[in-house]
């Protein structure tokens, strides 16, 4: 009873884990679809490729055109210009920041606490009630610390998003490369097996080998380029990751310094940190600008509609996948690039079957004189060596019946005047009229005969061995085709790979990019706010310039 309870408890736990996994997976897909829909609805425009006129670009991948008809320059521009505004913000922030700090002491409020808004006037004299009130300084510190807290949150989120994006890109690269390498290894193994001597007798073999050689050559070239692309992509991705991590850390350190300067009153630290933000704020806008268009492209690639019109992530409701992998809606279909190979192999199998059947048909016609009761004085009749089914035609479906269910009639020979069967000493065996068949034996099948069941007539033995040898070649060829080739060329081999890639690109990467894109924009805004409070704090955080005895805000 205790054992049963343990088993039931284990099953319940496994069921809960599976349900949780399915829920998390569905939740991730739902979030990704929401993000994709959000990006899909964003308007895109072209300018440079439309003769200097700002024109709205049609929605969808390549504006809804097929890949062959895509105007890539317009599509790429429309995607890049999505970040045009934020690039401009980054440039303006950088230029204004540099100008601001160059002329800070002259016309942007001055470097010391003074009267005047832009142009600095006389210095504040706290002894006569001039300076910054404690209440206003407190509010400034509070706002600063709130923004620093916000920076901590978006810093953590950005790091997580950046790490997930890196893992996703590396995972995608490995998935594609591993699939290519595995397929190539299988094709090479198939080609090596086809090079065996036993297959050389078939007419189509050379043509099949030629196609396989071409596929392998293309595959090796693709693998080589893919390895380079994969390596370069990982290198660039790792560089991107490190740059972003370093930038995020610097931004967080600077934000923290402004927070510390607010807490303990370090105006010089506040000023230095604010100067550093001249570089860091544009950096964050650039990070945002670089990644923002990516999800727009991903949205074009991944968005789809099912037959009910409900938006979903799926395979062949996706127009790009449908176009690239046309004909693979059914798992049992053959991938288009392998259709010619399949046709050749089918012809080869049919050729092998026909050759085997020709041998069998010849054997079915083979007959020898048989003397009733082995009496040389009796009138002989023609006895077929094989009891071939009269109503069957040899084919790939009936071949096994001929080989494993057809009786073979084996026999010995002797001189007609000899007393015992097998005695050829009393006549000239080359004179057929002086010899006769004897001791006829029924052997259960052609296969049994070829394996030693037939012991007398060497012609019958050789014929059955030839037939079974052809059948063995046909069987090994069929096994090679079924076990090695078919799994590679059928859509059932491709679709799980598409599902895996789609899950990486359309779910994992979309969610990861969103964790990086949105927080970097918020981070840039918060840093801008901290830059302002840091500039204000470069004076107000100095306790010497507060109104003495001030209680008001």
Swiss-Prot record:
Keywords assigned: Glycoprotein, Membrane, Signal, Transmembrane, Transmembrane helix
Membrane topology according to the record: Multi-pass membrane protein
Signal peptide: 1-26
Protein's name in the database: Transmembrane protein DDB_G0292058
PANTHER family in UniProt: TRANSMEMBRANE PROTEIN DDB_G0292058, TRANSMEMBRANE PROTEIN-RELATED
Listed transmembrane segments: 80-100, 137-157, 243-263, 274-294, 515-535
Localization in the cell: Membrane
UniProt GO cellular component terms: membrane
The keyword Cytoplasm is assigned to this record: no
Positions of glycan attachment: 162, 171, 178, 195, 315, 332, 351, 396, 405, 462
């Amino acid at each position: 009873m205790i054992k049963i309870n343990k088993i039931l408890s284990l099953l319940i736990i496994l069921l809960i884990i599976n349900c949780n996994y399915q829920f998390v997976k569905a939740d991730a897909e739902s979030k990704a679809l929401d993000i994709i829909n959000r990006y899909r609805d964003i308007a895109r425009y072209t300018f440079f490729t439309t003769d200097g006129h700002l024109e709205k670009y049609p929605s969808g991948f390549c504006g809804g055109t097929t890949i062959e008809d895509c105007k890539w320059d317009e599509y790429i521009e429309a995607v890049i210009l999505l970040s045009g505004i934020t690039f401009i913000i980054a440039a303006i922030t950088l230029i204004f920041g540099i100008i601001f700090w160059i002329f800070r002491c002259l016309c942007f409020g001055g470097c010391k606490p003074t009267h005047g808004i832009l142009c600095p006037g006389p210095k504040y004299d706290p002894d006569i009630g001039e300076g910054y009130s404690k209440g206003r300084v407190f509010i400034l510190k509070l706002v600063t610390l709130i923004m620093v807290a916000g920076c901590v949150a978006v810093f953590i989120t950005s790091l997580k998003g950046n790490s997930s994006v890196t893992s996703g890109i590396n995972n995608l690269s490995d998935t594609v490369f591993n699939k290519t390498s595995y397929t190539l290894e299988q094709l090479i193994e198939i080609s090596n097996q086809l090079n065996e001597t036993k297959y050389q007798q078939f007419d189509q073999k050379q043509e099949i080998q030629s196609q396989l050689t071409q596929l392998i050559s293309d595959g090796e070239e693709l693998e080589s380029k893919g390895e380079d692309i994969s390596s370069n992509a990982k290198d660039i991705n790792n560089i991107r990751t490190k740059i972003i991590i370093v930038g995020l850390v610097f931004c967080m350190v600077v934000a923290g310094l402004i927070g510390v300067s607010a807490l303990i009153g370090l105006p010089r630290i506040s000023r230095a940190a604010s100067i550093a933000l001249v570089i860091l704020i544009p950096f964050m806008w650039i990070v945002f600008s670089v990644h923002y268009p990516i999800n727009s492209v991903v949205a074009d690639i991944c968005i789809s509609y099912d037959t009910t019109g409900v938006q979903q992530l799926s395979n062949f409701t996706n127009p790009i996948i449908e176009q690239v992998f046309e004909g693979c809606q059914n798992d049992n279909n053959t991938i288009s690039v392998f259709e010619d190979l399949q046709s050749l192999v089918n012809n080869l199998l049919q050729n092998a079957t026909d050759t085997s059947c020709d041998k069998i048909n010849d054997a079915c016609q083979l007959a020898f004189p048989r003397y009733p009761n082995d009496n040389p004085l009796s009138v002989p009749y023609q006895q077929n060596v094989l009891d071939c089914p009269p109503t069957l035609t040899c084919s790939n479906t009936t071949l096994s019946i001929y080989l494993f269910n057809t009786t073979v009639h084996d026999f010995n020979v002797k001189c007609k005047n000899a007393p015992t069967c097998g005695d050829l000493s009393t006549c000239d065996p080359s004179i057929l009229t002086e010899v006769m068949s004897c001791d006829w034996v029924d052997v259960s099948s052609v296969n049994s005969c070829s394996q030693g069941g037939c012991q007398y007539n060497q012609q019958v033995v050789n014929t059955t061995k030839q037939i079974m040898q052809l059948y063995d070649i046909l069987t090994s060829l069929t096994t090679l085709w079924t076990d090695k080739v078919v799994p590679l060329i059928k859509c059932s081999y491709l679709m799980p790979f598409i599902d895996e890639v789609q899950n990486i690109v359309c779910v994992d990467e979309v969610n990861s990019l969103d964790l990086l894109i949105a927080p970097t924009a918020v981070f840039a805004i918060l840093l801008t706010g901290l830059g302002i409070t840091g500039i204000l704090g470069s004076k107000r955080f100095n306790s010497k310039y507060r109104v003495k005895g001030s209680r008001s805000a």
